[in-house]
Amino acid sequence: MRKRRKMLKREYDIFKYQNNSTSLMISFFDPYYQTLCEFFDTEVHNFYPHIQKELEAVVTGQKEESGFGGNMLNIDIGKEETEVYYQMDDESLGDPCFIPTEELYKLVLEWKEMEDEMHSGADIFPVTLED
């Protein structure tokens, strides 16, 4: 029997801007995933339906591979693994990172659930998850 890999330890919190608007933030405890944090904060925040659709198409086998290009970051979605990287070739922005595609898909769905919780006014933040 294959041992199930734990998902990344992460924390969701709410960032409040001066104009009283809020944004969901996700942080991963492993610094390797800093670029992934940026991907959620900029791209998933703005383009959730498109990203979810492309990941789902690969995870369910409708497509062998796919990709998405956002405002700052891109993802190359493979059957087993997805690369998250900055569009600009500038190492000061952050290094690319790789994550199992199915895990990224689950994290994107979870992020949407957390965003819905935030908008409902749920008093659960900050919340740390590791499953």
Give the location of each predicted region.
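Amphipathic protein-protein interaction modules
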Residues: T60-E115
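Negatively charged, low-complexity tracts enriched in Asp/Glu with abundant Ser/Thr
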Residues: R2-E65
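Short, highly charged C-terminal tails/helix-capping segments
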Residues: S120-D131
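A generic alpha-helix propensity feature with a strong bias for hydrophobic helices
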Residues: Q34, E103, L129-D131
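A structural detector for beta-sheet-dominated domains
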Residues: F15, F29, D76-G78, Y85-Q87, ...
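Short, low-complexity, polar/charged sequence segments that are solvent-exposed and flexible
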Residues: V44-Y48, E103-K106, E117-M118
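Weak global preference for isoleucine
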Residues: I14, I26, I51, I75-I77, ...
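Secondary-structure boundary elements
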Residues: M1, E113-H119
